[in-house]
């Protein structure tokens, strides 16, 4: 695995795009190697987990509210919302909002426990929504989700190594 050193910079540093974190993440995401079968299976299970939790929260107020907001932004060839007819499409950012809210509402999806915790499954709704709208294939979706997991888990480990916790902030 490639190691990327991350540190804060002043806005005035005006880093070259190749030195910015977003660029480094894009390099990871665009890697041409095929993930191992165990990784592919894990991602498929995480997608099922996310969709299941979203359906379980389908009638809860936050999920209903986010879904209503998303439905106000229809888009031909857009993205789907968990639990609705797959012919109904909305702009990807709104599908990500509705699906992400539904997944997070019950907070039953995967958790990465280190010195702190995070939910790398939170990456799935936006990546899925963009992949749908862009017409990506299944392997592109899997690689996008793997990238989201890899980056989030490693950032959490890095933050935990310096005794930072979001739970203690005011």
Outline where the language-model segments fall.
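N-terminal core-entry segment
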Residues: 2-167
